[in-house]
């Protein structure tokens, strides 16, 4: 049970660090040789993952990532996990909004520093985009800009 909770906490930290643009925190979730598969982009190292995410998720982009209903299987020092993703993206400067769902498929490895991701990636179940009405007020918190 402790390993299950440690893996859940790792994924929760990944989502929190992603939305607060804490790139060092995101990097700490991965082993150096980690890989990632995002829609329309693949990464072959932890450095490549952080480069991609920090470039795609500019400070003015507001995001919310929630991971639900983890299905985690542990085999000694390795584990796999499937997570249900619900995400929202707001880009007020472009009057753009996205909401979607998907399934994450992760692989984890136990290291001397605890559990880390060796692969993450998701496939969409749906994605809905819309325009933000100019009368809608969106106030971005400092934490969402990485401050």
Stretches found by the model and what they are:
Residues 58-147:
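A beta-strand edge to alpha-helix "cap/lid" segment located at domain peripheries
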Residues 1-32:
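Short, low-complexity N-terminal intrinsically disordered segments enriched in polar/charged residues
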Residues 23-87:
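A solvent-exposed, acidic/Ser-Thr-rich amphipathic alpha-helical stretch
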Residues 11-12, 35, 58, 94:
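Residues at structural and domain junctions
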Residues 16, 39, 94:
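Short, charged/polar micro-motifs that form catalytic or ligand-binding hotspots
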Residues 13, 48-51, 103:
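Alpha-helical elements of Rossmann-like donor-binding domains used by nucleotide-donor carbohydrate transfer enzymes
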């Amino acid at each position: 049970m402790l390993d299950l909770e440690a893996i859940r906490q790792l994924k929760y930290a990944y989502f929190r660090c992603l939305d607060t643009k804490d790139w060092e925190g995101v990097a700490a979730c991965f082993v150096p040789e980690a890989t990632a598969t995002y829609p329309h982009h693949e990464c072959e190292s932890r450095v490549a993952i952080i480069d991609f995410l920090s470039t795609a998720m500019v400070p003015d982009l507001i995001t919310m990532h929630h991971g639900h209903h983890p299905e985690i299987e542990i085999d000694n020092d390795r584990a796999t996990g499937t997570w249900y993703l619900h995400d929202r993206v707001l880009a007020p400067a472009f009057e753009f909004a996205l909401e979607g769902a998907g399934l994450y498929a992760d692989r984890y490895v136990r290291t001397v520093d605890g559990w880390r991701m060796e692969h993450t990636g998701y496939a969409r179940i749906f994605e809905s985009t819309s325009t933000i009405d100019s009368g809608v007020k969106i106030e971005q918190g400092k934490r969402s800009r990485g401050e």
